[in-house]
């Protein structure tokens, strides 16, 4: 399962009902993964809300949920551009931003479900059940 920044923020901030749904999805996940650029985005968002302790908060959560970090390759970059062309802000109602496009690309290339909170990813071709989006034809 690929984890988006929005899911981590919902969990850390205790956003109801999303935090509960994210925690349940993570409890059922084998090995949740976040791409390296998404980790950077997540740290920036958490730092804006929590200051310098954001790194500690993130690393503690990462350890608790067994979150691994994946590399981001040229193939990911090309898939990110394709995601932007199809679903990017100003091009589609999903209005995916740069970080969203990277997360979408990571999930797409890995054929992995996507854990996210918000109204953007459900506007893509992912089929959402709660906070987890699945690729069409894959449950």
From Swiss-Prot:
Residues 1-127 form the PINc domain. Mg(2+) binds at residues 4, 100. SUPFAM superfamilies: PIN domain-like. GO terms for molecular function: magnesium ion binding; RNA nuclease activity. This is VapC ribonuclease Mb2004c. Signal peptide: none annotated. PANTHER family: RIBONUCLEASE VAPC2 (PTHR33653:SF1). Its cofactor is Mg(2+). Its EC number is 3.1.-.-. InterPro entries: PIN-like_dom_sf, PIN_dom, Type_II_TA_system_RNase, VapC_family. It is an enzyme of class 3 (hydrolase). Disulfide bonds: none annotated. Belongs to the PINc/VapC protein family. Pfam families: PIN. Keywords: Hydrolase, Magnesium, Metal-binding, Nuclease, Toxin-antitoxin system. Toxic component of a type II toxin-antitoxin (TA) system. An RNase.
